[in-house]
Amino acid sequence: MNTIQGIQMIGTQRSGSNLLRVMLDGIREIVAPHPPHILQRFLPLLPKYGDLADRSNFYRLAQDVCELVTVNPVPWEGIAIRTDEVVASCRQQTLYELFRVIYESAARQAGASFWLCKSMKNMLYAEGIESTGIRPYY
């Protein structure tokens, strides 16, 4: 498996999208963990991290994002998100790149060809998501 494809689910509250996410997660080729809402939670906080071109600032952000995934109320079972590995896999020092690497890592660890994120607010961040090279199915 060389290519991992993203799927960004666009749902609304009380629409049944979480049930669909759980059903899709049951397909071996798709990993669809409960969303920790990485972009929604961290984009407003980015100014607190300073210049992300500074490796230490980016690493601190990566640690916090990885911790968010780790303490997500619904665990990502069988998936280990390690800050050092995530940072080493990043091609850019951006929050969007952390998002990409974390979801692709989850897919690799699950042996899946697709990852699915059901974070509803991500539709507002499509341009940033796609700036990493991700061309998700919506």
Please annotate each region the language model reported:
Residues 29-34, 135-138:
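Short hydrophobic/aromatic-enriched beta-strand-loop microsegments
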Residues 18-30:
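A conserved segment at the C-terminal end of the G1
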Residues 9:
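Hydrophobic anchor at the beta1->P-loop junction of P-loop NTPases
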Residues 12:
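Short, aromatic/basic-rich helix-turn unit that serves as a nucleic-acid recognition element
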Residues 118-121, 125-138:
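Conserved phosphate-donor/acceptor-positioning beta-strand/loop module used by diverse small-molecule
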Residues 15:
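ATP-binding Walker
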Residues 33-117, 121-123:
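PAPS-dependent sulfation machinery
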